Amino acid sequence: MILDHLGFAFKSYTYTDTSKAFSEKAQEMFSGYTNKMFFKPFDMEKEANSQGYEEHSYDAVVALNVIRAAKDIGKALQSVRSLLKPGGYLVLLELTDQEPSRIRFLMGGLPSWWHSQEENKKWAPTLSTAQWHSLLQKTGYSGLDTVAMSQDGLANPFSVSVTQAVDDRVAFLRQPLFSRTTLDAEMEDLLIVGGTTLETARLST
């Protein structure tokens, strides 16, 4: 559990769910953190500010096996992105290995499994890591910065991924020489300290 590792080293933690019943159960489960925890409904398919959330006010969002259930994943990611400060992080737990047939067999009978209206998810509401990376880059994120997955996809087809909310400033800080933000036009000299490596050579050409 995240809170077991955080202890009280955080200012506030907002627990969200579309169901009020789940929020009530969560309040009982996390009763020891009542001074720092807030419980509010959140529908990722709606704009965050229309639900009483302040935009760009969160340092991190943790989404556990939920984004893929949206009718439109791109819009859901944009809604979550609006919650994050520039430079904030989104942590995703999602089913990314699409090979195990047992998952489709077990979940295929549930209406929510077919909630998506996207054409590329006709047979299963899951995306590969490459698809997640591309979609995240299109919706205001850096793409998948890191992915942790089991070596045996059949045994554990889930991945934990981290991506960063980016704007021009954050993109510049992440990759100064590749950012769309231009350097000072009056800069006459640029010193690159990196030794005689291939990466340094690529930067200087």
Segments from the language model and where they lie:
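4′-phosphopantetheine-dependent carrier domains
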Residues: 1-205
